[in-house]
Amino acid sequence: MFTSSSPEQRKPRQSRQLPGAACEECRRKKLRCDRQQPQCGGSSLERRLEQQMQTALLPGDDILNMLDEPAFTVFPSSEDQLGLPAFNITNSTRGEQCQDEQFLDHFADMKGSEFTGTLTTTSIPELMRADLTLRADYRRGNGRDQLYFDRVHIFTPIIHQRRYLSWSKDAHKNEARVCLQYAMWALAASFSAPFQHLRDALYRDARRMLDLLELSDGAMATHHLEQAQAWILVAIYEFMRMNYQVGWMSAGRSFRLVQLMRLYGIDGANSPTQELPQTSSMEWIETEEKRRTFWMAYSLDRFISMRDGWPLTLNEQVVTTCLPAPEAAFQSGKPASGGFLSETITQEDTGALFSFTECIIIATVCGRSLSHGQKLEVERVYGDVSPDFWQRHQWLDAIVKKRIEILSLRCASATEVVDPLLLFTYMMAQTTVLYLCKLVKSVTWETDKSNPIVQEYEQRSLAAAQEIVNLTHTLKQFNFLKVHPFMPLPLYLCAEFLSMYRSLDASFDAQLQEVQNALRNLQAVNNLARTYLNLLQVKEREGSLRSSSEEIDL
């Protein structure tokens, strides 16, 4: 049985082999040529795309100027925008057919091709639409690549710019690198006002390609670093623009890839880097990218587990990978060592560390604090609190104090706007004080409410909460598109603490309002802020209902 079709669909399909010789441009690009004179449809199509991109997109200087506008200039995407309608390419039915065939042939003929044996013919045109637009855009000068390194790299410094640019234009790059490119472009677009209308389409293509890559033949035989990097970037995008659960699952995929590639043991005694010394700058850069990818996944694992106290995936106890080298050394390709985490975290005088390294140290403290609290819960199940609790607690407390002193000096001494990664790290350090205070109160509540340790922690928690509130004013210096993507996390944890312990200080109500206002300001560009605001409202209602119930019982 055949379904009815339009007159155009009932026409017999033309032979794929057309008479005449293909034009030089199509032969060079390995595309199917329609042999039209004086110019084939493929070449004219690309020229029209470039012209429309030049009209639709602003020059580089204008884009950079627009990026500094306030966040409220961001326009939300709509369903009709997700199909990229800004690039309205009109053509005859014959021209569209030629266009589709050219790119179908292009994907089918590529050696080491993008998605060889994995893409179906129905999914190729969807990817082709975005690919057409982006190819024309990037031919204008790496605008979105540069946007990634200007806006996103400061939060996720895992990609070497020169190395990336060396393979980014290669038509025969492997599938993992194509996935990474689309993930980079999607995240970069989400941090840019002019490119907001592109972000969802880029994300959908990146996510679809990553899913297909995992299902391809030989997917389990080899894993590329770029695949893990792409999942990290996609997870960050999903936390910001989708929802927490979707981002959580994607983050888990990146953690498993990091484990499969053994990135936690890059500098161990029996690792390849120790057995085969690196002789070239590029070899060191590739290894440093692996280190940074591991530490990014490691930090992400700890930060996203803080909200609900979830168990960690990446075990600190088996890590033998050095900390990241300084950024200048990384980008210049000059080998340098970042040292091991256990040594750096206990050193008395470390000087001014790389911002990413400071973030990793605080992520480690967050992870150890989580494990500290989880051990406490287990100890309660089996009996009394172990004496080891206080030893662990004092050790963590000493590290937090030290890092807060260092970070406060660095933030206070900044002559210009504070580094957003450093600001986020400092706020997470203050949040850890609040978390440790909650643990102390939960333990001493069962013994002595007037314990001096409790009183000391109450005072320190008051100071930490006040400092976080003060830092929310610093956020006003930033375009909201330049704020760290996980900034809503310390704001939420602080607001939760202020709401839970309002009785500690009369100023907590006013401070709570300031923190909630900061979350409201961020929710336009970050769904995490909206999620946390909703959670606070739910907890507020539950607290009100509980208070009403207690009054009735009395």
UniProtKB/Swiss-Prot annotation:
Q: InterPro entries attached here? A: TF_fung, Transcription_factor_dom_fun, Zn2-C6_fun-type_DNA-bd_sf, Zn2Cys6_DnaBD
Task: Kindly list the cysteine pairs connected by disulfide bridges.
Answer: none
Uses in industry and biotechnology: As colorants, MonAzPs are widely used in various food products for centuries. Moreover, MonAzPs also possess wide-ranging biological activities such as antibacterial activity, preventing hypertension, lowering cholesterol levels, causing hypolipidemic effects, and displaying antiobesity and antitumor activities.
The protein in question is named Pigment biosynthesis transcriptional activator pigB
The free-text function statement in the UniProt record for this protein reads: Transcription factor; part of the gene cluster that mediates the biosynthesis of azaphilone pigments (MonAzPs), a complex mixture of compounds with a common azaphilone skeleton very widely used as food colorants. Positively regulates the expression of the azaphilone pigments (MonAzPs) gene cluster.
**Pfam families recorded for this chain?**
Fungal_trans, Zn_clus
Source organism: Monascus ruber (Mold)
What are the record's GO terms for cellular component? nucleus
Q: Which gene encodes it?
A: pigB
